[in-house]
Amino acid sequence: MEGEGVRNFKELRAKFQNLDAPPLPGPIKFPAGVSPKGDIGGTQSTQILANGKPLSSNHKQRTPYCSSSESQPLQPQKIKLAQKSEIPKCSNSPGPLGKSTVCSATSSQKASLLLEVTQSNVEIITKEKVMVANSFRNKLWNWEKVSSQKSEMSSALLLANYGSKAIHLEGQKGMGLTPEEPRKKLETKGAQTLPSQKHVVAPKILHNVSEDPSFVISQHIRKSWENPPPERSPASSPCQPIYECELASQAPEKQPDVRHHHLPKTKPLPSIDSLGPPPPKPSRPPIVNLQAFQRQPAAVPKTQGEVTVEEGSLSPERLFNAEFEEPHNYEATISYLRHSGNSINLCTAKEIADPTYEVGIEELQKPGKNFPYPEPSAKHEDKKMKEKQPCELKPKNTEKEPYSNHVFKVDACEGTPEKIQMTNVHTGRRNMLAGKQEAMIDIIQTNPCPEGPKLARHSQGHCGHLEVLESTKETPDLGVSKTSSISEEIYDDVEYSRKEVPKLNYSSSLASSSEENRELYEDVYKTKNNYPKIDLDGKEALKRLQQFFKKEKDRFKIKKTKSKENLSAFSILLPDLELKSQEVIIYDDVDLSEKESKDEDKLKMWKPKFLTPKEKKEKNGAEESESFSPRNFFKTKKQNLEKNRMKREEKLFRERFKYDKEIIVINTAVACSNNSRNGIFDLPISPGEELEVIDTTEQNLVICRNSKGKYGYVLIEHLDFKHQSWSP
């Protein structure tokens, strides 16, 4: 063991003295149980791989090369330690091999030489790291160069690795460990101590020095920073040198402070602003209520000429009413019917003209619903129509009710419509037309072969297939068929109440379809007396308008007579009032021009005034003329305001001056100058103002009144009397 250590140290010294020397065959493996610090505590010893990657080991090993008396401070420039400490001394403690060795004096000189080279190399590393930190191509090129150097070094390191394996196995046997146990311990401990020992990379770069040592060392350290190995077996990795173990063991609590400088930069997540707004939520599907479709049947056209007709049980009264549920939409859709035990295939005039068409039968009435339907109102029928129209465009799901939807083809050819009398009715099939024997049926279309089923129409207008065994043909006139179609078109918009429709006798045979239709619609019109209907001619609307205007006219007439009676009440002659009121009533119905009516009103208003006595006429003449003329309305209002103000001022004057005499104007005077007195009882005057003299006093004061009706004292000196100036 001692000879091998000396030999390896000599090779290490030769490598640093001469750079062209072959690479180091392999570092020394420590025996089991020997700690690099000299304590038998079993702290973790760090192993550095050949490419500069740290690996921790939990083996309690002691180094055979420890200096007991010499120590040297290690201060790398780029490794930031919390405190500068010297290499601790290793005590000569007994190990599993039973002896301890001391390093020679030349080891301290070589350690100082190693530190100088390390400092220079670390400076180069930092410069290169700044230059090529973000360059992807330089990193790729470095990867390729390192891999090529590893392949060259593999042959030289084979021998050294073999020797180190033998030493390591002997140490394991001394401790009683199998080769698998230390490997597992190394794997578990390596991942824990790996990040805290990244600052030891700088002293380790001297293992793989070749032609350009500074460049190769920088490549190894950069790779160790970028890709630290998750685990590595101790047999395939060289051991750490003595001085590196001592550095790694110094101040383990200070190492995590330094490691963040060597960690690779992580790419931050993009900001929310750069990503933009999130995509909007998808719109919710519309809420659809299908209860109306479940309760009420609907006809769904499949294609052009393809119709689904709903099947169920109906009374004969229901059968007739269902025909008129969609009168205004007769050409676009097919009304649905129910009959007891059979379903009826309906068709429109458009679909009859097509040579081929398909009819589907759909069962709508659920089992257990045998109760009669209530009488629908007009609003209810309007709702039905709105619900049926969107339903026609959506085909129903045939998977839920496969037994209720059957489609079959009917071949039809154009021909003259015929009329037959049913003798034997085939009721075994669902798609056959329901009817009684000896009922008149119109043959719309039939196949060329006479024994096939015929497309027939009942006397009520229902269409369907009919298998006729014996029939008597009758071809009606074209004019009759035209009138029947016209009559059907005329009464398309007629609405029916379910209770008032009379029951039809299906066994009665009719002479012609036109007569049947006419009688039918006449009966319907009779039963519709109590039901609100639409008058096509507008006569009903005109009648209502006339009644409305008549009522309004009567009201206006009553108001007019009342107002004129009130006006005529002022007159003295009472018998004339009756005549006037009768005249007004008589002539209200006559259309007169506005001028004539105004003239009559004026005459009637002024006539009683001429008949009044003269005394009343003289007193109230002026007031009445002013009140009745709109031009003098504002004048009278102004005069009334002035009168009220004069009365108020007079009342105030009597209270202040305690004046009980009658107010009489003695004289009038004109003010020559302003009044110098400004007391409460003095009247403010302005030069040129005309004043009325009411009374005199003992002093040289006069009680005067101005144009505003205010009273007060005025000095005689300021007045100029008119009678003096205007006297002859």
Curated annotation (Swiss-Prot):
Region (Disordered): 17-76, 250-287, 367-390
Stretches with biased composition (Basic and acidic residues): 377-390
UniProt superkingdom: Eukaryota
Post-translational modification: Phosphorylation is required for its function in T-cell activation.
Annotated ranges, domain SH3: 664-724
Biased composition (Pro residues): 276-285
PANTHER family, per the entry: FYN-BINDING PROTEIN 2 (PTHR16830:SF1), SH2 CONTAINING ADAPTOR PRAM-1 RELATED (PTHR16830)
Protein name in the entry: FYN-binding protein 2
